[in-house]
Amino acid sequence: LYGREESFKDLYPKWIYEEKDGGIEPVIKAIDSIEGDFRIRLSSLEPAVINAGYVRRLLKYDKLCHHLHLSAQSGSNHVLSLMNRPYTSEEYMDIVKVLRECDPLYGITTDIIVGFPQETEEDFNDSIKLIDEAGFCKVHGFRYSKRKGTAAAGMGGQIPSEIKNRR
């Protein structure tokens, strides 16, 4: 959370993320009740820690901007599983649908990684389908790059650079 007033900086000095820990809703509620002409912007929430019901509750706050960066990583459940992501593309789209019900022009941006090890053309096409269905304002597209010491770096089925570049 960032605010125009310095006092917002220390309002809640730790990460307040997961719903099971109370989530960010109490902080948004407190800030929303402050008089003044300002907006609250959330960024980079992960579908693994929120769900459609949680998003629906957050949308009742008037000062909350109708923009969210919600990282998908992939539209393929196969690739999401390989990435050890604890959500499916269907769960991701449930969140998007709630946002669109609230405001058809709700600004949603995302990250998509192409060329993750073992990604097939069908997996890639699932990501394209998710992009089309979600109607993102912007997609931050990245080619997978091997990082020493990560589980993915040691996986079989590394995708050749020319295929990653094409995708």
Model-assigned labels for residue ranges:
Residues L1-E121:
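Conserved SAM/AdoMet-binding glycine-rich loop
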